[in-house]
Design a protein with these regions (language model features):
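Right-handed parallel beta-helix
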Residues: 6-10, 14-22, 28-99, 103-114, 126-142, ...
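Carbohydrate-interacting regions of secretory-pathway proteins
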Residues: 63-66, 114, 134, 195, ...
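Short, surface-exposed polybasic-and-hydrophobic patches located at secondary-structure transitions
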Residues: 36-38, 282-286, 308-316
Length: 324
């Protein structure tokens, strides 16, 4: 489902999907495409190269051959006053809900379950002024993700993702409760998640990720009042997350991401490999990370590691036992 304005400089207004039904795509084709054969990797390389060398968007025609570039299930492009309310989703080819360059909206009472490759729950990309509440996510990837475009295209669009609140949501399964990045080239600010739960197992509760190709900024991101079961990391910042791109394509231009103002407060977790791991970039260290009132039952590997971060404030961070 793709909703967008016909004119690039105009927005669709008051677009909505509501009701008690279920959106369930037929997955026969898409499940085959979850694999990454060589033609798919070559298509990714071609698309990345075109974007990095300023090939006009209209000339980036990729739906050919065996490229296997999967679509989002729900994609809103340049829409205003969006409402998503009350329905269920079962499975998705790629990101489940993608809100791209949208302004204003409410996402509530959704029951989302999708366990395929790249099945994020909801991705905000260069969007602003949204509330997400009372949703359940059961994902094959991250639950709630904040993005701001990749590299040259996002630098050109210069549209930060900002002013987003997520509350009273739960993630039943998935990689991350709140993910920031790694596509953050347009900048991210003013994100607040509170009163959410991850009762089972996740890789990370709060994950800030970027790399030396992204540029942009991340500032004023908050997590508060979260309860969790098991996690590899309660909080992680990693400034060199490249995944398959590391070897697939070269660095066309280096721009380090500015990260300033990451806050975690009142978080409990039954078991974690580590409480926090902060890996900044020596060329532009992360600044101002506050971690307070965090309680972990069992720590399995290490309590904390910090590199290239200025002004880490830790207060009342405790654990019951360390098991190695």
């Amino acid at each position: 489902l793709h909703v967008r304005s016909r004119r690039q400089r105009q927005m669709c207004i008051r677009d909505r999907i509501t009701g008690k039904g279920t959106l369930q795509p037929k997955m026969d084709t898409w499940k085959v495409w979850f694999k990454r054969p060589q033609p798919h990797l070559e298509a990714l390389k071609e698309l990345y190269t075109k974007a990095s060398t300023d090939v006009p968007v209209i000339e980036r025609q990729m739906a050919v051959g065996e490229n296997h570039l999967r679509p989002h299930l729900i994609h809103f492009n340049r829409c205003k006053n969006v409402l998503l309310d009350g329905f269920k989703i079962r499975e998705s080819p790629f990101w489940t809900i993608h809100l791209y360059m949208c302004d204003g909206g409410l996402v509530r009472n959704l029951d989302v379950k999708a366990h395929g490759h790249n099945n994020d729950g909801i991705d905000f990309e260069m969007s602003r002024n949204f509330l997400v509440e009372d949703c359940s996510f059961d994902q094959g990837d991250d639950a709630v993700v904040i993005k701001a475009g990749r590299n040259q295209d996002a630098w050109r669009l210069n549209t930060p993702c900002k002013n987003i609140v997520i509350r009273n949501c739960q993630i039943l399964k998935g990689h991350t409760l709140l993910g920031i990045g790694s596509e953050i080239s347009g900048g991210i600010r003013n994100i607040y998640m509170h009163d959410c739960t991850a009762p089972n197992s996740v890789m990370r509760l709060f994950f800030v990720k970027t790399n030396h190709r992204r540029g942009g900024f991340i500032e004023n991101v908050y997590m508060k009042n979260v309860q969790a079961g098991m996690a590899q990391r309660v909080l992680e910042i990693d400034t060199e997350v490249l995944y398959q791109w590391k070897d697939l394509v070269p660095t066309y231009e280096e721009r380090i991401t500015r990260i300033d103002g990451i806050y975690m407060d009142k978080v409990t977790c039954e078991s974690a490999d580590a409480i926090y791991e902060l890996k900044g970039d020596a060329k532009l260290p992360v600044k101002n990370v506050t971690i307070k009132n965090v309680k972990v039952g069992e720590v399995k590997k290490f309590v904390k590691k910090v590199n290239n971060v200025e002004n880490v404030v830790e207060k009342n961070v405790t654990y019951e036992r360390e098991v190695k």
